[in-house]
Amino acid sequence: MNTHHTLKTLAVAAAVSIALSACGGGGGGGSSGNNTGGGTTTTTNNGAALLAAYAVPASIAADVVTNYTGAFNVGNSGIQSNCANTALVSTTVVSAPDVVVFAANGASVKDQEVAADLFEQAVPQIRTALGLSTTGTGFDGTTKVQLCVDPNLGTGDGETGSGTSITGQTAQGPGAVIVQVMAPSSPNFDARYPGATSYTDGTVGLRYFDLFRHEGTHAALYSLAEPFGGMEAWFQEGMATTVAQLPMGSKASVLAAVQATDLLPANGAAAGDMGTSYPAYEATIGLLTSSAPGGLGYGLTNIPDFVATYKAKAMAACAQAIPSGLTPNPLSTVGMPTGLYNVCAPAAPGAVDGRLETAFDQAFNATFTSNGAPLLLHTADGADSLEATLYQRLSAFLP
């Protein structure tokens, strides 16, 4: 699914001080450790000064490549990025071990270096949280994530669509996962991260670094599902907020969000206001993965197995032999076995084939259990489904 994502910068951080681990959820990568190669910062409240004071690690500086000929390819994903515009993208990139960082709209090389450094710091934490291999490139072992930094982004923290209001987005691109984020030099940085004294210090889950943990988790999930994308919004956002450790808030606020709207709609779309829905998505992942009382105990490190089940069902539904005489769209053969093409590949930017939604539903129903019986996902699957009983289950699970 070519969905768009941004890490909400909650202005009411003091009111949402209960972290996931305090809710029995088993949070993801920690706020410290595995920060290999991290640059250093000087205390400041100004985004521009923060960037100027940032000491880029030598290993990242050595990854700068000039006259780069590769393209930031969005394909038919839902992302509209200025890094895909040859008139606006720089020919200089930072090609780090797990990510290639592009720059649009005059973003500086230092913008790119900071983004590469923070992404590389996030990678081992995400791998640990999901139980992925600690070796190889990116999250699938072979492919670098493509990331665009753009100072024009961040005028708001909207979730979908295009324009400058996006702070971060991730999607399944043609051949590589693509991400775009607000550059650290953005004039909108202070509004998104008010009072920031460092990219990595501050309230865990609300730092600029956590934007990279958040979008990096999306990138990991898309990498594991290549070439199909998909996966419902509640799952994607719940996983990203879990690994990035977004402060969850009170039990009452989570239950109010669940009661206010259907957060697990059968069409897979995001539901409700993201400012309140994020913690509820996070709590739902905690419910599924935690071994605390009321949790289903699936384990966060088993999530890649669930994604593999989804990918297998998507392959079964979407892979067809290329008919004799047909030359399929190249976008439909990316990541497919020889002689097969992906009939579920998006025919228009951002489109999600219904067969992918069905595959996700089937994978969930075949994976998760409750009291020894399959836990069905949607109300259409059964009266005791997660969608139909989410309020009751979270009420029993959250302390």
Regions found by a protein language model. Give the residues of each.
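Juxtacatalytic substrate-recognition/specificity segment
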Residues: 81, 85-219, 223-224
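Surface-exposed patches in mature extracellular/periplasmic domains of secreted proteins
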Residues: 127-150, 227-233, 252-257, 296-314, ...
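Bacterial N-terminal signal peptides that target proteins for export
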Residues: 2-11
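N-terminal low-complexity, Pro/Thr/Ser-rich intrinsically disordered segments
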Residues: 35-102
